Amino acid sequence: NPMDCLRYYGDFQNSEYYLVRPCGDLDEDAVDSRISCTQLWVLRKLEPQEFFLHALAYMADHPQMPDGCKVKRERAQAWNGYAVVRGKHPRAKGKLGDILAFAREAVNGPKIEHLSLCVIDGKEHLPDTWYDDNFEECEAA
């Protein structure tokens, strides 16, 4: 789970995140999605938006797995440059430059039916404004 990286390297704005391929002997951790390996191939550095797109894709591919400590339920305010929110009616707000990542669940279960991501740019997406996963302005609820 990419979001587990933020548990260990939580200073998002001053950290770098990479897409890697674990190789050799692999060992999974029973606590979260950590693994250890004897070889690690670094494929490329991820831009901030790419990191959260990978996190959203992981949630969609593994809807029953824990989301990680940085994912909020239903509503979130960005902190440290981002907000990741999951729920039936996810909504979030942030400051200029913040990334908002949304995972909307199906009404009848945890399956993810819609993923979306935006950057608060001050033009199309405004600071301190609540948005739903379709980037429509909404109430905090």
Describe these PLM feature segments:
Residues 2-141:
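Short, glycine-biased loop/turn motifs at secondary-structure junctions and
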